[in-house]
């Protein structure tokens, strides 16, 4: 039986799961801001941000947020109208290293591209080679180092 990823809109009922994931050492290394949970829960109804729980064959294992590029993304430079940004993490440690990061990111973005989104951007820490490799496997290309409110980031882009 083939495996497939599903993307369910996140609800307030998912917050205990996301809180547990944020406490996992492999997530906390990169999502360590103490206000992260507050930002995630406070943005559940934000019109420019969609948040999802990613599942594989019915098992939740990751968090994904997709957002409209806005004024606070000036460090990304000029982007085509309709460009979206993406952030994600795999919460379940046993799902690391199996190609799931690049797999679900590619599946999600391919779906957006069929809806007319022209470009996706992502901005991992330049010190996170695992994430950078997953994004490259998902079709992203390195664009350059940018300064963000969270510090230096590697801007990566994937065009439709």
Q: How should these model regions be labeled?
A:
Residues 31-53:
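Active-site rim helix/loop that mediates acceptor-substrate recognition in acyltransferases
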Residues 1-13:
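Conserved N-terminal entry element of GNAT/NAT acetyltransferase domains
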